[in-house]
A protein has these predicted regions:
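Short beta-strand edge/turn micro-motifs at domain boundaries
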Residues: 104-119, 130-169
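A short hydrophobic beta-strand element
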Residues: 79-89
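Short structured motifs
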Residues: 66-70, 127-129
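Structural motif
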Residues: 75-77, 149
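C-terminal motif of bacterial Sec signal peptides marking the signal peptidase cleavage site
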Residues: 2-4
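Short, cysteine-centered beta-strand-loop-beta hairpins and adjacent loop/turn segments enriched
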Residues: 88-105
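C-terminal low-complexity, charged extensions that often adopt amphipathic alpha-helices
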Residues: 121-124
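Core segments of small alpha/beta cavity-forming domains
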Residues: 7-68
Length: 169
């Protein structure tokens, strides 16, 4: 009788599950994930000054978010791996371009001359939300590096820059 040798769970499956654990709450607009991202967004910008609810902005930003794992390749030494993931998301650059277009249209109207500063800030918020809502998601290929650390597959710190690049492509 041959004894089965098992070196533990399949690295590709473990890494795929880790990616799903991180991206599924975003894809599914999980309330805890939305709240965490909204808190981060509100701490970085005074969205409330423009009448923007942080959670609503995050939901608009994540509209259409999706991902698909293209491949997970483990290095020959078994200590590192690369996951290729197609991330579909809205681009802040595209939303900013759209906000500029809407702002130019608004600035050309006579409406702006009769507005108080509060009304103008509210209008800016409306423009930002409209631009984000109108921005179509696009797909960007991201490459996530993993390392086997003390028996656990861990995503490298470079993942943040990959996600940043996807949202600012």
């Amino acid at each position: 009788m041959l004894a089965a040798c098992s070196s533990g769970p399949d690295p590709e499956e473990v890494i795929s599950q880790d990616i799903a654990t991180q991206f599924d709450p975003i894809k599914n607009l999980d309330q805890a994930a939305v709240d965490e991202l909204a808190q981060d967004a509100e701490s970085g910008a005074d969205l409330s000054d423009f009448g923007i609810d942080g959670a609503e902005y995050i939901k608009a930003m994540l509209g259409g978010f999706d991902y698909s794992i293209v491949s997970v390749n483990v290095a020959e030494d078994g200590q590192s791996a690369t996951a290729i993931v197609n991330v579909t998301c809205k681009s802040f650059n595209a939303a900013n371009d759209r906000a500029n277009e809407i702002s130019e249209e608004f600035a050309a109207s006579d409406e702006i001359t009769d507005m108080s500063m509060d009304d103008l800030n509210k209008k800016i918020g409306e423009i930002l939300m409209q631009a984000m809502n109108e921005t179509e998601p696009s797909t960007v290929e991201c490459e996530f590096q993993y390392n086997l650390v003390d028996g656990t597959w861990t995503m490298s710190d470079s993942a943040e820059s990959e996600i940043y690049n996807a949202f600012f492509s």
